Regions:
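N-terminal segment immediately downstream of the Sec signal-peptide cleavage site
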Residues: 26-104, 196-239
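C-terminal membrane-anchoring or membrane-association module
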Residues: 258-271
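C-terminal segment of classical bacterial N-terminal signal peptides
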Residues: 17-24
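Hydrophobic helical h-region of N-terminal Sec-dependent signal peptides
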Residues: 11-17, 255
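Short helix-loop boundary/capping segments
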Residues: 106-107, 111-194
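Small side chains
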Residues: 18, 65-67, 148, 158, ...
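A short, hydrophobic C-terminal helix/tail in secreted or cell-surface proteins
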Residues: 242-261
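Bacterial N-terminal signal peptides that target proteins for export
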Residues: 2-10
């Protein structure tokens, strides 16, 4: 009877450890100096509060831009990147223009951790420096109201080269490189074609050249980027077990297994 009670106690212990361990699977993740909580109710929500991009006007034009992340799962920079800047550069190619609709392909966004905290919106060369953190590559999809398939879809108010307030974009991206990629490859965002991307991108933008600028062909000059906007990346994180929690769960299960083995051995000896 005592042996049976011991086994039941061990089972209860193992189950309790398992439940406790499960509750700690989604502790904050830190990768390359960037910290976020995959258990956040906002996970995953990454916002660029002001980016700048070049102007395009016809098929085959290349859209380029840069910016800095200002919010990660609702947390500000002092939490998710203390003492550093999480900056990005991006590029897309215009594949189709139909009226006020523009489609883009061949897209990517590269993120970098800059430990010098030197980002300056007025200086494009301060983005895309430091340690590579994440590469997002365009994912082909479709979007209601657009004719073709593409990686990014824009609806323009005004003209394509000079969009006005109310212009917006939506796109699909996959995490394909960088140390953060394994934590973000969750394929949770429907791409409109029966498949799933890692991220959806939602943006709003308008022509807002820096005061005193005339359009420049030089990509290191802020006057090359007359369009300003905001963007949000929506995805999900991969929860990674905490080593200590996983170890305790394993210890509890091992203890249960040992007692069960001893019980069987003693039973065999008595028969």
């Amino acid at each position: 009877m005592l042996k049976k009670k011991s086994i039941l106690a061990a089972l209860a212990c193992a189950l309790a450890l398992g439940a406790w361990s499960g509750s700690t699977l989604a502790t904050p993740i830190t990768v390359g100096g960037v910290t976020w909580d995959p258990n956040s109710l906002l996970d995953l929500n990454v916002q660029a509060l002001n980016f700048r991009e070049s102007s395009v006007g016809s098929v085959s034009n290349v859209l380029t831009g840069y910016g800095m992340i200002g919010s990660f799962n609702g947390q500000n920079q002092s939490y998710f990147c203390p003492g550093c800047d999480l900056t990005f550069t991006f590029q897309y190619t215009v594949s189709n223009i139909t009226g006020s609709q523009v489609e883009f392909n061949s897209g990517f966004i590269n993120f970098f951790v800059d430990n010098t905290s030197s980002f300056n919106t007025l200086n494009p060369t301060t983005a895309g420096i430091g340690t590579p953190w994440l590469t997002l590559s365009g994912h082909n999809g479709s979007f209601l109201g657009f004719v073709g398939t593409a990686q990014l879809f824009s609806t323009i108010q005004g003209t394509v080269s000079k969009p006005l307030t109310g212009s917006s974009g939506i796109g699909f991206l996959d995490a394909t490189g960088g140390p953060a990629a394994p934590f973000l490859q969750t394929h949770t965002q429907a791409d409109g074609m029966g498949g799933f991307a890692d991220f959806t991108l939602n943006s709003s933008f308008l022509f807002s050249a820096v005061r005193g600028c005339t359009l420049s062909p030089n990509p290191t000059n802020v006057c090359h980027y007359p369009i300003s906007g905001t963007a949000t990346l929506i995805g999900r994180s991969v929860a990674v077990p905490e080593p200590g929690a996983a170890g305790l769960l394993g210890l509890g299960l091992a203890f249960l297994g040992l007692l069960t083995w001893r019980r069987r051995k003693e039973g065999d000896g008595q028969s």
